[in-house]
């Protein structure tokens, strides 16, 4: 497999999504992060010593540590009749990741974080889900003045 990842922030967001998804399936945080980052970069023993980018680790550990808070925020922005349990794991993971970056990464403008997670959503989900994620995160950004870092 050729390495299509370039260590850009978008690529690292995508790898963070992959790691978070694997954590939901029972993987340990560091192992999931190492696999998501290195599965197409190195083989054998070298994979054990691969240094993970700070941005990737910050996203994965941050979402993992704030999962309950993020889930509560997502739940409060769902339309009547919807619950967190009704969302697919893919959409939940994307929402958590996008919301975490919007809420906690001051150096990333909200609109950038929003647009980036939509691009990841288009790759791993369908167009309807990408629009749903865009709508929910846009609603959060518009309601929370401190979130509008753009």
Swiss-Prot record:
Statement: the UniProt record of this protein carries the keyword Transcription regulation: yes
Database matches in Gene3D superfamilies: NusB-like (1.10.940.10)
A cellular component annotation (GO) from this entry: cytosol
GO biological process assignments: DNA-templated transcription termination; transcription antitermination
Pfam families reported for this sequence: NusB (PF01029)
Keyword Signal listed: no
Keyword annotations from UniProtKB, A to Z: RNA-binding, Transcription, Transcription antitermination, Transcription regulation
One GO MF term: RNA binding
Transmembrane segment boundaries: none
Family statement: Belongs to the NusB family.
The protein's role, per its UniProt record: Involved in transcription antitermination. Required for transcription of ribosomal RNA (rRNA) genes. Binds specifically to the boxA antiterminator sequence of the ribosomal RNA (rrn) operons.
PANTHER family attached to this UniProt entry: ANTITERMINATION NUSB DOMAIN-CONTAINING PROTEIN, N UTILIZATION SUBSTANCE PROTEIN B-RELATED
Identification of the protein by name: Transcription antitermination protein NusB
Lineage of the species this protein comes from: Bacteria, Bacillati, Bacillota, Bacilli, Lactobacillales
